[in-house]
Amino acid sequence: MKPIRALAAGLFLAATPALAVDIGDDGLHKPAWLRETFKDLREDLAEANAEGKRLLIIVEQRGCIYCARMHEEVFPDPEIDALIRDGYFVVQMNLFGDVEVTDFDGTALPEKDMAVRWGVMFTPTMIFLPEEVPEGKTAAEAAVALMPGAFGKGTTSALLTWVRAHGYENGEHFQKFLARQLQEQD
């Protein structure tokens, strides 16, 4: 029986790298749906709108075990992957990065300083933006939803759906939407 277990473990380990998400030079996960941009959020929003998608900023950091959990267990789920690919234009920021980011109000700062400006303290943090950002607003001020931390598939799927469907406009709080989704599944 031990040789069979050893063979099974070996096959599992051999298959694991194929399932893993690439890691960039900055130590952050790089899923295929992530966009490489100049990090001018005004341009990113215009491009997202042109594609009929919502702008989503994901703030992460090297070595973040919760970021790894999202990239290894949650984002690869076929339903969640499809929600992201079909509905979101995703830009990644490094909590401690030095790449310049230009906010909607024109302020340009390194990623790490922009994260401080927005009050981002945890990774991952997902910042969901509306299709139109009022003049003079920052991304944090304009956000329709912020999700600090790692959540399971159900909550993540529900939030992606709620934002895409403009749930924040009809007065139904996300937690109420999530509870209703869970009841409908029963």
Regions found by a protein language model. Give the residues of each.
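Thiol-based oxidoreductase modules, predominantly thioredoxin-like and allied folds used
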Residues: 77-109
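Conserved redox-active cysteine motifs that mediate thiol-disulfide chemistry
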Residues: 61-75
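Short active-site neighborhood of thiol/selenol oxidoreductases, capturing the structured segment around
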Residues: 51-65
